[in-house]
UniProtKB/Swiss-Prot annotation:
This is Cupiennin-4b. The modification Glutamine amide is found at Q27. The keyword rRNA-binding does not apply. It comes from Cupiennius salei (American wandering spider). The lineage of its organism: Eukaryota, Metazoa, Ecdysozoa, Arthropoda, Chelicerata. Keywords: Amidation, Secreted, Toxin. One of its GO terms (molecular function) is toxin activity.
Amino acid sequence: VYGMLFKFLAKKVAKKLISHVAKKQLQ
């Protein structure tokens, strides 16, 4: 159960990091 929750949180964090980096790259 915790493994699924961790994967879900990891994906959300990864998406936030990717979008954040992408915005910095565009500037």
